[in-house]
Amino acid sequence: MFSLQDICRKHLFLLPSSFDEYILQALGLYWEKHGSLQRIRKDAVFVQRNIVLSTNEALRIAASEGNERVIKLLLSWEGDFHYVIIGALEGDRYDLIHKYVSQIKDYHNILSLIQNANTFEKCHHLSNSNMWCLIQNAIKYNMLSILQKHKNCLTHEGENQELFEMACEEQKYDIVLWIGQTLMVNEPESIFDTALARIDFSLLTIGYRLLFDNKMSCIDIHDEEDLTSSLTEHLEKAAIKGCFFFMLETLKHGGNVNMAVLSKAVEYNHRKILDYFIRRQKCLSREEIEKLLLSGISNGASIKTLNLLLSYLNYSVKHIIRKIVQYVIKEGDFTIIVVLKRKKINLVEPVLSGFMDDYYSYCFIKQFIDEFDIRPEKIIKMAARKGKLNMIIEFFNEIYPHKDDLKTMFKFLKNLVYTMKHKKGKEVLIGLIHKIYQSIHLENKEMFNLLKFYVMYNANIQFIALCKDCFKLAGFKPFLLECLDIAIKRNYPDIIQNIKLLLKYE
């Protein structure tokens, strides 16, 4: 049970100025060698009425002195018992540690609170872990002096590489530099990958410092070609990430901002990089900018990126229109067509034609149709000219999904044939019209009209097939004579011959 005195001590935040040393000792609010002790807020104490300490700092000092009474008081003031362990280690009070050992789940949890390397190592020793674990934790908590102390143990290149990469990941710059300059490491150039992955400029500069201190055997700084190649590779990776300042730092040491580098900036839509090197530095010719534009089409660059590249060309693309169309058709990304159409450069029709030629699915082409609001008759006529009957059927299934719509399709197609000039295209549509006819019911007059339609467009096969259906209809012979007149006027010998045969058997 708590005494009334304990409760008062725990919650008393203001000491009367009249309390002398004797009363403070009686209340348990006196700290030997330090003076009065009072709580001023949840995480701080007042010592001798003029020194403010955090509760945990006071706890550490008390533990280093072995003052269990003050420790107990500070713990009641919400101090962290981990600082008891830290203070006890500083003062070599292992008996005190033994009293609190049951509350400690893992000594590694205390390491982050320790500032002193000697105390850090003592604490780690209590966990009964090995030297490798100590070194890893020393990196994690930036204890360079521990690595320096145990340098003679760090002789394995593979393990040193792991430590180097860990230091880079943890962004412990002093340790990174020390390992790079002091220990044998397999792949010190991995620092550049980490710097780019984390977008860490400090790590990048350390990497170049190590490189030009000749600490990277994989790159010969005295071989200009090898150095330029490596630095250009860094520029390319930086362009992918959009790390503009990384590129400027790299260029201080060498490398070339070439087409491969800027193509990555286009692919990943890093316009700041493009604007700096193309507009300000003027490092590309018009032909190279055109190639970048085509690269952007290939890699699905955004509207803003494509607009930027087009602006460098003053939106003049006459010389590469054919290539633009080819790239769009090949890659299936028509963003550039949207951009150009806004600038009154219309490439919709040649691209649509190319999509049909390359057997793009109707689902894809439908996106294109919707984007540019293309009229259905234009799509069907183009598909008919190319003999893409399946695509026409898919299109009709999309806009006329019900069987009741077949008559509407029938009339629509007949009207298209009236306005179409392309002979092969007409044949495709007439073939489809006849298929629809076989699935719908027509009145006698409508069948005769269809027969006349076939004669007008010299559709001999469909004409013969329909004649078989009309043979027994009243008025068929007079109508055949009318059809014969049309065939003679238009000089359709096959239909003329077939009509004459039919008239013989009538």
Curated annotation (Swiss-Prot):
Keyword vocabulary terms for this entry: Early protein
Conditions for induction: Expressed in the early phase of the viral replicative cycle.
Statement: the UniProt record of this protein carries the keyword Nucleus: no
Family matches, as InterPro entries: MGF_505
Annotated signal sequence range: none
Pfam families cross-referenced by the UniProt entry: DUF249
Similarity field: Belongs to the asfivirus MGF 505 family.
Task performed by this protein: Plays a role in virus cell tropism, and may be required for efficient virus replication in macrophages.
Name used for this protein in its record: Protein MGF 505-4R
Lineage: Viruses, Varidnaviria, Bamfordvirae, Nucleocytoviricota, Pokkesviricetes
